[in-house]
Amino acid sequence: MSSGGLLLLLGLLTLWAELTPVSSKDRPHFCHLPADTGPCKARFQAFYYHPVHRKCLEFIYGGCEGNANNFKTIDECKRTCAA
């Protein structure tokens, strides 16, 4: 296979992986962590996955520390955690 064909295949596989929803059994463990504003005092709009409600919700992030269940956009949260 030519390098162009391999590059096309890699691109298609990447697109497929990006568009495939995450099932609950494949959901990363951090999606089950609670929203954590962290100790800093900034006020950034952020999103986290709420496992009981099974959806991404908004929260205010302080700007430092916190945990991995923290996304800049609701779409990023949905792609990562929502099934």
Curated annotation (Swiss-Prot):
Occurrences of domain BPTI/Kunitz inhibitor (ranges): 31-81
Cysteine pairings via disulfide bonds: 31-81, 40-64, 56-77
An annotated Gene Ontology molecular function: serine-type endopeptidase inhibitor activity
Residue stretches spanning the membrane: none
GO cellular component terms listed in the entry, alphabetical order: extracellular space
Annotated signal peptide: 1-24
Compartments (UniProt record): Secreted
Top-level taxon of the source organism: Eukaryota
Annotated site location: Reactive bond for trypsin: 41-42
Gene3D superfamilies associated with the record: Pancreatic trypsin inhibitor Kunitz domain
Keywords: Disulfide bond, Protease inhibitor, Secreted, Serine protease inhibitor, Signal
Location, primary (coarse class): secreted
InterPro entries: Kunitz_BPTI, Kunitz_BPTI_sf, Prtase_inh_Kunz-CS, TFPI/VKTCI-like
Family, per entry: Belongs to the venom Kunitz-type family.
Function of the protein: Serine protease inhibitor.
Protein name: Kunitz-type serine protease inhibitor 28
Source species: Drysdalia coronoides
